């Protein structure tokens, strides 16, 4: 079914309006001529002809159908312009590209051409009745709303005198409560009634601009602000921050501002773990592996980004836990339904980390020290030259810990070594070191680029391995080391080609190398002693020094086009290629291989906004092309390498929609749906060389995700604010990927569960009084059940309708803080805070196996933390003290692996602007 050319659209004004704007405002998109330069190979020639034919067909169809339904209204045709597709056939150039991107043509270009053809074929034959019905219903509502629109849209961009975009600039209508803020790109959009208005543009540190306009049509107006050394009188308007706007969007998303807690925060994991519906389960102390779940879906079902680019680009071992918190402005958590603009195949959700975007030079440095020999140091800085637009941003983060906390009630040998007893020994081989250093340099505010940056980064981690996947498997000499280099180029241009169009492009390449050292013929115990063994510690085989080189290439292009104040289009292309070059220095039985997994993801989004922004709609579609090239053949009985072809290309299609309607500030409702696809990543398919076996026959996960939420902000009295949100969700997952533990070997493997259904509810409420007293509480319930009725042999499955094991299903958290202003000096403040986290007990294995009263379970946990922060000189200098787990509870997470007990930390931070 072709949605845009079916009879419904032809017989309504929707298609006519949409096509009129598209044809008249997109220069050369439908009227250009595509030429091919010499030197292109036949496959590239076919691609050119395919694209050219598609453009010509679209042009003819749009103009023909507009002519049928409008005889008097003519469409302004843009000047005819040639579009030249440059395809080089130079052999030397091909060789250089091939040596840098590895097999570029085989793994990237061919699947990309295949993807373009499959997009057209898939869309033409896809049958999604439920989605179409919802789509048509919302479009009908949109048609009704078009007649009710009597607002004029004033939009534009605010910059300083050097052309640098300014964020959080207020654009207000004088003598009214109407107003808005600019975003990170300096863009704004404000709806007003037709007529004459006076607009006030103001920002702290800049001179205020007042201008009067007589508006009867939509208008674009840019402003340039001049710096001011005098205080600017504030303009009172009702506006919303970017975090508030995102929370109130059509999709289910939480935003976490880092700035209020940056002085006491040591790791992003601490902040994210206090969010409703989100649970982080760590295997140990600082630097340990962790698993993050969103609404019951976890592991690699959740994707991580930094400024819209996959976090993997910094290195495979750069995570939320060791990313410098000084870099971060806020964290966006998408639940279940992920916008196509991120260009990902996430199934359960996504975490997008937004870095700081200060407009002036600054230095932000911090150092913390704590229990278990823990040290952290972070530096983030920015140096700007206002006249030239030159910007340099260095950053570095260092973490170190011995993690020598005590293990409670574990089996160990007595002093003579002749019998086993239970004791509380210290961890003795769990040291961790990480380094992340990066520098970014570029220019802003030029006519050819609003932002152009080149960056380079280096990350390194050294991790001693103390246990396997269970704590009874003790190591004493094994370790894992990794380092990664990254170079990237980022280009942003606002009003690209035409007014309202924004282009963002990123090219990134990472050289990632990890080594697992497992050479000791020893078996260790918790007392630190050992006996000589005939096998190495991790794999139980010959000594090994195993190398994994996983180069990562990322290409991301995002084109956003705001057609007017009510309609927008977003086109996103994302390519991700991960190599897997593995070999061993000692183990001659280990078979080297050079595998690769390449993904192409194309996303298209159409958004609407009506009734002064009260109603927002979003519709999106995603096309996925997966191209694995698997060459490893060893351990075929475990990995399934004898059951797959070496190189395959498969295509998948996803889609979704979202609707939000805000009745008034205290009450709003939103619903969203996505048919999502999640392709297995290299770590799941190919293992990690230490504790995870490969499984090359893994199937992609598919899920139908639904969210329904009520939320609102209520001001019961002056200086009092209450925010609440209640959310219900459904996740119907096929080929659910989860970990299977092989306890005898201390190994894990990712496997498919045919079907899992997850349903749940969550709620959160926040209270704020005058920015001083802040309270928060949330609770989450998740019911994940196995839906496989029969095994592969046809026999009934004993675990049918059982809860999925080893996953928290009921948990919650609470926070309280109070800030004293001007307590000792005029420009200081003292903040007292505490947090509480609770997790209900859950079974370690399937509840159908064994006796429910005696089978292993992870007990309920109650973790309390307290902190105090003192700041002076307008937050320039800050000292924070924290006690985590001050009740010294025994805390377990993954596979009953103990976490640290009571610990103390101190942090000093200085911010110079």
Predicted regions and their residues:
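Short acidic/polar hinge/loop motifs at secondary-structure boundaries
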Residues: 188-191, 309-336
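Periplasmic-side early beta-strands and strand-to-turn transitions of outer-membrane beta-barrels
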Residues: 368, 387-471
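A beta-strand signature from Gram-negative outer-membrane beta-barrel systems
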Residues: 116, 222-223, 325-364
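Extracytoplasmic beta-strand/coil segments of soluble accessory domains associated
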Residues: 269-310
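Gram-negative outer-membrane beta-barrel transporters
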Residues: 723-724, 729-732, 751-843
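Short, acidic, small-residue-rich periplasmic hinge/interaction motif at the N-terminus
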Residues: 159-161, 169-174, 202-206, 216-260
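Membrane-embedded beta-barrel scaffold of Gram-negative outer-membrane proteins
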Residues: 662, 670-674, 701-759, 780, ...
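Face-selective signature of the C-terminal outer-membrane beta-barrel domain
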Residues: 439-461, 480-640, 644-666, 672-674, ...
């Amino acid at each position: 079914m072709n949605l845009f050319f079916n009879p419904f659209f032809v017989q309504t004004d929707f298609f006519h309006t949409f096509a009129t704007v598209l044809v008249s405002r997109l220069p050369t998109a439908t009227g250009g001529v595509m030429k091919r330069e010499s030197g292109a190979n036949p496959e590239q020639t076919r691609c050119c002809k395919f694209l050219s034919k598609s453009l010509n067909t679209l042009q003819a169809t749009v103009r023909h159908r507009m002519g049928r339904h409008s005889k008097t209204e003519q469409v302004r045709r843009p000047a005819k312009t040639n579009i030249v597709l440059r395809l080089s056939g130079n052999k030397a150039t091909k060789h250089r590209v091939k040596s840098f991107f590895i097999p570029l043509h085989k793994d990237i270009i061919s699947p990309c051409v295949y993807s373009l053809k499959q997009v057209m074929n898939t869309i033409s034959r896809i049958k999604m009745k439920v989605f179409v019905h919802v789509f048509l219903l919302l479009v009908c509502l949109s048609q009704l709303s078009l007649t009710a629109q009597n607002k004029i849209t004033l939009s534009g961009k605010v910059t300083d005198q050097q052309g640098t975009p300014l964020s959080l600039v207020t654009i207000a209508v004088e003598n009214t409560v109407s107003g808005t803020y600019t975003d990170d790109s300096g863009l704004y959009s404000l709806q007003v009634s037709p007529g004459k208005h006076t607009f006030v543009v103001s920002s702290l540190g800049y001179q205020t601009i007042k201008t009067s306009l007589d508006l009867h049509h939509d208008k674009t107006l840019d402003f340039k602000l001049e710096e001011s050394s005098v205080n600017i009188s504030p303009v009172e308007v009702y506006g919303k921050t970017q975090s508030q706007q995102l929370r109130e969007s059509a999709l289910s998303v939480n935003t976490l501002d880092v700035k209020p807690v940056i002085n006491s925060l040591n790791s992003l994991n601490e902040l994210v773990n206090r969010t409703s519906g989100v649970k982080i389960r760590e295997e140990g102390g600082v630097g340990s592996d962790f698993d993050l779940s969103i609404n019951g879906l976890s592991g690699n079902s959740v994707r991580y980004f930094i400024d819209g680019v996959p976090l993997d680009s910094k290195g495979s071992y750069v995570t939320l836990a060791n990313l410098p918190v000084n870099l971060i402005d806020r964290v966006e958590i998408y639940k279940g339904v992920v916008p196509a603009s991120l260009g990902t195949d996430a199934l359960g959700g996504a975490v997008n980390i937004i870095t700081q975007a200060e407009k002036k030079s600054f230095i932000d440095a911090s150092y913390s020290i704590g229990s278990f020999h823990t040290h952290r140091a972070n530096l983030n800085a920015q140096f700007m030259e206002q006249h030239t637009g030159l910007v340099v941003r260095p950053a570095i983060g260092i973490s170190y810990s011995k993690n020598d906390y005590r293990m409670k009630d574990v089996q160990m040998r007595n002093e003579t070594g002749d019998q086993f007893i239970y004791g509380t020994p210290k961890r003795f081989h769990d040291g961790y070191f990480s380094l992340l250093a990066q520098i970014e340099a570029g220019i802003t505010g030029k006519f050819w680029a609003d932002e152009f940056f080149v960056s380079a980064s280096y990350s390194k981690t050294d991790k001693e391995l103390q246990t396997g996947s269970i704590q009874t498997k003790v190591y004493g000499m094994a370790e894992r080391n990794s380092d990664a280099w990254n170079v990237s180029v980022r280009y942003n241009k606002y009003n690209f080609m035409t007014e309202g169009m924004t282009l963002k492009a990123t090219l990134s390449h990472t050289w990632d190398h990890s080594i697992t050292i497992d050479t000791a013929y020893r078996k260790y115990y918790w007392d630190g002693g050992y006996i000589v063994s005939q096998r190495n510690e991790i794999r139980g085989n010959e000594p090994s020094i195993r190398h994994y080189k996983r180069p990562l290439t990322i290409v991301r292009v995002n084109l956003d086009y705001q057609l007017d104040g009510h309609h927008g289009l977003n086109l996103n292309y994302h390519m991700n290629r991960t190599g897997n070059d593995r070999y061993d220095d000692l183990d001659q039985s280990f078979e080297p291989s050079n595998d690769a997994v390449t993904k192409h993801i194309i996303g298209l989004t159409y958004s609407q906004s009506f009734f002064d922004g009260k109603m927002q709609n979003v519709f999106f579609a995603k096309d996925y092309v997966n191209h694995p090239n698997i060459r490893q053949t060893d351990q075929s009985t475990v990995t399934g390498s004898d059951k797959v072809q070496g190189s395959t290309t498969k295509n998948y299609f996803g889609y979704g929609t979202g609707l939000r309607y805000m009745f008034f500030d205290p009450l709003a409702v939103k619903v969203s749906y996505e048919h999502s696809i999640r392709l297995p990543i290299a770590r799941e398919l190919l293992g990690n060389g230490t504790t995870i076996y490969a499984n090359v026959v893994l199937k992609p996960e598919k899920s139908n995700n639904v969210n329904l939420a009520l939320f609102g902000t209520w001001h019961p009295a002056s200086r009092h604010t209450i925010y609440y949100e209640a959310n219900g969700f459904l996740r119907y997952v096929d080929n659910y990927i989860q970990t299977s533990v092989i306890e005898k070997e201390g190994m894990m493997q990712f496997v498919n569960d045919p079907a899992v259904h997850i349903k749940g509810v969550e709620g959160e409420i926040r209270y704020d009084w005058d920015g001083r007293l802040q309270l928060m509480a949330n609770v989450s319930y998740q019911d994940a059940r196995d839906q496989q009725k029969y095994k592969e042999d046809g026999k009934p499955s004993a675990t049918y309708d059982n809860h999925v094991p080893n996953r928290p299903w009921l948990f919650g958290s609470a926070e309280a803080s109070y800030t004293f202003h001007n307590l000792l000096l005029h420009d200081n403040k003292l903040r007292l805070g505490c947090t509480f986290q609770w997790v209900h007990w859950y079974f370690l294995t399937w509840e159908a196996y064994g006796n429910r009263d005696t089978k292993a379970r992870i007990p309920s946990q109650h973790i309390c933390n307290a902190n105090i922060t003192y700041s002076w000189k307008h937050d320039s200098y800050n000292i924070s003290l924290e006690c985590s787990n001050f009740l010294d509870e025994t805390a377990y997470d993954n596979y009953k692996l103990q976490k640290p007990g009571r610990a103390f930390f101190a942090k000093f931070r200085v911010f110079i602007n």
